[in-house]
Amino acid sequence: MTFSIDGQDVDLKNYVLINKIDYGSSMTKTHTIKWKWPYFGEYDDAADFINKNITINVEATGRQAGNDLLTTIKNKAVLDNINSTYVNNTTPGIDLSLAPSNTNGKGVYILNGTENNTYPIYYYRGNVNDNNLIYANYCWKIVRTTETGGIKIVYNGVPTNGKCSNTGTNSQLDTKSAFNSASSSITYTSLTSVGYMYGDKILIAEREKYKTHLEDLGTSKYTETLAGSSITRTRHNQNAYSSAVKNIVDTWYKENILTNFSGMLEDTIWCNDRALSTGTYSIDNFDSNTYFAYAGRDRLVTSTTPSLTCSRDIDKFTVSKSNGNGDLEYPVGLLTADEITYAGVGWFGYSSDSYLATGLRFWVMTPSRYVKVSNEQHVFDYNAERLGNDGVSNAYGVRPSVSLKNGVDILSGNGTEDNPYIVKP
């Protein structure tokens, strides 16, 4: 509120905080304002206001009910286990073993089994063009919502004249990265190199030791250089040091998000599922096979049964210990192979008909297998048009992912590439 006395503006202001609630279409509200005199500043004598006309100008800011991002997504979503506008299968619902299409999913879907939760999981699938967003002056694609009503988004480059139509290298960070690089604490042949964070250097001949290591929930103090700074922290022994790709992600976050934009983010779980396969390609059967597999490979290659549940608490990467392992410095990570499968990027036989398609490879954070002939661990990646897996030493694109807090509002836009959502807290 600003004031004038007999038409003369004065340097006197007052602010009224109205509860953050939705008033609906009617915005008429009555509020009582009281001042105490003398007032600090130029007008410190109440006599100055006697027999004068005082004009109060009110500027109100707010939002229309239902204009928050979560509600906008919710209003578009349909169940994924029924036939709908872009789902028409003999067995009703989306078939995740097949590529997305006009008859197998294109839009926003409610994950079956979560529809009655306080915050159901909504996810985008297929060649959609209504999940584009600008946050922290960068373009992002909305991937899915979280169990707390947050909104997980993935990096998609820099806006051009307010538009977000990036593909190829423009959709990734400038620096490509190996998932893990050889150093004094790790090698490409170490079984622990599939970790987004990793512990001891353990070779294939020591695989019994590796199985024991994966059960180690102990902690110790570790020192490493992360995002250009030396830090010493107590971490789980399995998560002592940051992988090469994590260092790239954390450095970018520190330089571009931390200072001005981190308040809009939630501390969600980033799942680096290191659970071992219990099937034919288990680590115990390695001598008679060409590789041993992780549980993610069983879910996404042997069958197509993606999951958004992280089975091992030690693999739930978070900043806080209240909802995960507490070993992260910043609330940022990579997508999982399961998440991009829901988005429409699956194993062999898929096409590039997904909003995540960029024409170039980029890392996700789900371990796949250890290959005997190359003596190297493999992690899943987006392989130009489908889900692939490659050795951790390969340098591929990096697309950081963050999760916006529940309650983020849409300032403008409709989510298209030409008119992306602009969001505010």
Language-model features: where?
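C-terminal, structured domain-capping segment
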Residues: 17-70
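Surface-exposed interaction patch
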Residues: 1-12
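Long, domain-scale functional regions
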Residues: 16, 20-23, 68-425
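Residues that cap or initiate secondary-structure elements
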Residues: 9, 39-41, 62-66, 159, ...
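Short, solvent-exposed loop/turn motifs
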Residues: 9-11, 43, 139, 386
